[in-house]
Regions:
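A common structural junction motif
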Residues: 32-36, 79-85, 91
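Long, highly charged amphipathic alpha-helices
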Residues: 23-26, 82-86
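Short S/T/G/P-rich N-terminal loop/turn motif that feeds into the first structured element of a domain
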Residues: 1-58, 66-76, 99-103
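Charge-dense polyanion-binding interfaces
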Residues: 86-103
Length: 103
């Protein structure tokens, strides 16, 4: 199955304090109602062990959008802004974002 016309937004989060994991999960769950998002996956590193796998992050967020414009709308959505300010910035030591589009 090919994900045609898809903008992929993949975010990895490294917590300052591991004890804040459930709090960050609650924050990520606040993003679910954002209408610009087509699909959402909140996850943790899989139990896989290969040299090319980075399992150092604490949580990941994978979002699928129908277009770059939908992703831009997500960035400006007040729910996303509140998540970034209230959860990601205070709780995370590092955040890495990888965006991709179809070839």
């Amino acid at each position: 199955m090919s994900l045609n016309n898809t903008f992929v937004h993949h975010v990895h989060f490294w917590l300052k304090n591991k004890e804040d994991k459930s709090r960050l999960i609650r924050g990520l769950e606040t993003l679910i109602p954002i209408t610009h998002i087509r699909d959402i996956h909140i996850g943790v590193p899989a139990d896989t062990d290969r040299d090319v796998i980075d399992r150092s992050y604490d949580l990941s967020l994978l979002l699928l959008f129908d277009s770059p414009e939908a992703q831009a709308g997500y960035q400006d959505d007040p729910i996303h802004v509140a998540f970034a300010e209230g959860y990601a910035k205070p709780l995370c030591a590092k955040v890495v974002v990888q965006d991709s589009v179809n070839i």
